[in-house]
Design a protein with these regions (language model features):
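Broad gene-expression machinery/nucleic-acid interaction feature
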Residues: 95, 106, 166
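Short, charged beta->alpha transition segments
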Residues: 92-98
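Glycine-rich, often proline-containing surface loops adjacent to acidic residues and nearby aromatics
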Residues: 99-110
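Terminal interaction module
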Residues: 1-77, 84-86, 114-275
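Short, solvent-exposed beta-alpha or beta-beta edge segments that form flexible loop/patches at the rim
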Residues: 82-92
Length: 275
């Protein structure tokens, strides 16, 4: 049976250390929710206009919405009255569906080549739309929409290594509620307090703890950050660098599946990555 491919992304609303005095102190989940409900619009210099609509909630914090663009296009039509073929200027509005979970900032973007060549293009437009939201503007939040990489290849190399000599991971300001307590969560607070957008921390040693490195690597992937390491793959071998890389994690869902079912599959796949 044919299916639709959904790509996993993480949206972050990173609040500044000093919030505007006249605006309520909203959580990232609340900012996410308000931004969706505003149904913002985005005009590009190319003349195309992007929209967010068709918002449907499954509960208070999960649901789906449509994102698409409107452009002027020339349609070739047959005019029965004149008996001639004519060119008629009309609007074209391709769109795709996105399922979401505001609790953890999780997105599942449906692939649709008629709208964009890849999910990354759609993700950039989602970020642009959220940046136009009055709630985002008033809170001064920075919006990030990044794909969730599959960490399994990286983790397999970590598990099989003779020794882990160094480990490096990036972090951003606080947002993900499920960030690990050891690395991502405290460093994200540090980034916010010092006024940094992003940061990276590298640790080195003769043989780093494999279980801790694996745990932080999973959290790093789930929060849409990046990681790298230097390992000795086998005894007597030279140190080599490895990186967590690849495309967004994706799932294929049957065409007749409801959007609730789609979100459930997205959440299950996210849990696999998070570990």
């Amino acid at each position: 049976m044919a299916g639709t491919e959904y790509y996993l992304y993480r949206v972050k609303f990173i609040k500044p250390a000093q919030m505007p005095l006249l605006f309520p102190n909203l959580s990232p989940s609340q900012i996410f929710l308000e931004a969706i409900n505003e149904k913002p619009e985005l005009m590009l210099s190319s003349g195309s206009e992007w929209h967010l609509g068709n918002v449907d909630f499954f509960d208070q914090l999960t649901g789906s919405f449509a994102i698409g663009r409107t452009t002027k296009t020339t349609l070739e039509k047959f005019d029965k009255e004149s008996g001639n073929f004519i060119d008629k200027l009309d609007d074209s509005s391709p769109y795709t569906t996105v399922v979401f979970d505001c609790r953890i900032g999780l997105l599942g973007i449906a692939k649709k080549s008629k709208l964009a060549p890849d999910a990354e293009t759609v993700a950039r437009r989602i970020r642009g739309l959220f940046e136009k939201s009055e709630t985002v503007i008033n809170t001064g939040a920075e919006v990030k929409v990044n794909f969730i990489p599959d960490p399994q290849g990286f983790i397999q190399k970590i598990r099989g290594a003779y020794a882990i000599k160094s480990f490096k991971a990036t972090f951003t300001g606080p947002n993900p509620v499920d960030a690990d307590e050891l690395f991502q969560k405290p460093l994200s607070v540090y980034a916010q307090q010092i006024g940094a957008r992003t940061g990276a921390l590298e640790v080195k040693g003769e043989a780093l703890n494999e279980e801790v490195v694996e745990s932080v690597a999973k959290s790093t992937a789930a929060t849409a950050n990046t990681a790298s390491a230097r390992i000795i793959p086998e005894e007597g071998k030279k140190v080599i660098p490895i990186k967590m890389k690849g495309d967004a994690v994706s799932v294929v869902v049957n065409l007749d599946a409801s959007y609730r079912d789609v979100l459930e599959r997205i959440q299950e796949e996210y849990s696999r990555v998070r570990g």
